[in-house]
Amino acid sequence: YIHPLQMHFADAVRATLPAHLTHCYFVTSGSEANELALRLARAHSGRRGMIVQDHAYHGHTTGTIDISPYKFNGPGGDGAPDWVEISELADPYRGRFGYDDAKAGEKYAADVERAIGALAERGHGLAGFIAESFPSVGGQIEPPAGYLSSVYERVREAGGLCIADEVQTGLGRLGDAYWGFETQQASRT
């Protein structure tokens, strides 16, 4: 049911987005938003495989638990479905490549190529990659410069969609940018 205020709000949201992002679809929760993004990636690509970051949390519905290592690798979890591949969390504080490594973003992004290959070996084409632009459940991590833009380039080359889960970190919460992906110059690569 459409109300004029919804249209006004959609216009206000669109005004904060890069010009090529022109549509809004309102849902009632972050879980529902990510479930919809998962369905759209599959419909667009005709494939099922998803790449997720280690420690990620994307919601509490069945579909979003399937793409949330925080849940499926936690107590009571059943592990990753065979159509999900976990990529290394780009964590310059605790990870393999630190703040002192100018190429850390590119090095972490290279793991996505491994993940694409692992999905293919199991017979799954890539539908998409989902990540919080600033992983919150993973530790409130600011990824190294160039990480997301490099990942997005690889994912798009493989025919997948790039999903920025901005539920906890978007909408102006980061200060310098309205959306977390903007801090990584990752909206269109």
Language model regions located:
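Conserved N-terminal phosphate-binding loop of PLP-dependent enzymes in the Aspartate aminotransferase
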Residues: 1-189
